[in-house]
Amino acid sequence: MLFDGISQLTDEQIKTAVLRWLDSSIAYGVSAVFDAGFPEHNGVNERIYACLQELDRQGKLPVYVDGCYVLTQPRKMKEALEGVKRFREKFNTEHMKGHTLKIFMDGTLKIETAAMVTPYVDTGLTGATAFDAEQVSEILKELNEAGLDLHVHTVGEAASRVVLDGVELARKELGDRFRVKVTCAHLWVQDDADLERFAKLGVIANFTPWWHSGNVGGNPIAYWPTFIGEKRAHSMFRCKTMWDSGALVTWSSDEVFYGDFKNWSPYLAMEIGMTRWINEKTRFEEASRTVAAFPPESERMNIEEMILGYTINGAKQLGVEAAKGSITPGKDADFLVFEKDLLTAEHEGFSYNKPSEVFFKGKTIN
């Protein structure tokens, strides 16, 4: 219901929104994205991708876009598998691709629909996953045969566990033939027992760093224990632990609206990923400021890790690391020029950074 209004958008409205997004992407120096789609609106997703593809054919798409087909219910598995195959065939221009199935495995923590291993403290409920491990395994085998990839919305600890279990089952059956790139996105809460399984199973861990201040203004340190207890509430967003375990960690914005695009900024995400705090020095809305750094401080990233997660690691997630993600002879010359050295810039206030020059395939586009 949240997105029902988008089905009424005209083609002109879609193009206007897409062009605004492109302007923002160019300004921030974003040159490659994964679009995670709207749930239950694959028709709208298809129209957006068609708009992007037409821009690409006209030479007006200076961003590489990897789209997806969205699956939310087991009864639509067959339809979705056919849909993602169709998207791959239909969207295959130089900068517009579509070779990924997106699954919404659970909901969100704020309304207690995120799937948990340990129950919520106020209700005693655990939420639920949309699929079980056996269904995930079957989907993976189909995707593997077709040469397609999987991206999964996983907020709660049980949601990512189901994906990990499904990958384990599929790998056990397929062995060295398994080649699906599997990404778990968001990862608000993780059970200790699953942290090292990402690296072991080759599952990509995608986080949304601008949430890592606690994703609620004021005092998230006191807010989240009322939902999931102090131990779990103070060990959320365990990206550094994942990184150190050897897992491939990538970053995202989870932007779903066309506001002022502030939370589309990778520099905002980098700041919060490094500080786990939104304060008066952060280029963000005052209502989102928090009282202190969100625990644990041990999960704060350094600038090198933030840059790698946005560049070569992101390219690996999309399967385009042979052409993108690093400045290497033979690769696309996608790079940015800054007035400041990002490696030595202050962490607090890092969100005010912006490139002075943006190059896409060797040409200045800003």
Regions found by a protein language model. Name each.
Residues 5, 16, 141-150, 158-182, ...:
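His/Asp/Glu-enriched, well-ordered alpha-helical/loop segment
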Residues 39-59, 191-197, 201, 263-266, ...:
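Short glycine/threonine-rich loop-to-helix capping motif typified by GTGT followed
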Residues 93-113, 202-213, 275:
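Non-cysteine beta-strand/loop elements that form the S-adenosyl-L-methionine
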Residues 38, 68-72, 155-157, 187-189, ...:
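An acidic- and aromatic-residue-enriched active-site/binding cleft used to recognize and process polar
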Residues 110, 365-366:
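Short, isolated positions in well-ordered beta-strands
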Residues 1-85, 103, 108-159, 176, ...:
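Divalent metal-binding segments
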Residues 60-102, 179-192, 197-204, 217-250:
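Phosphate/diphosphate-binding loops
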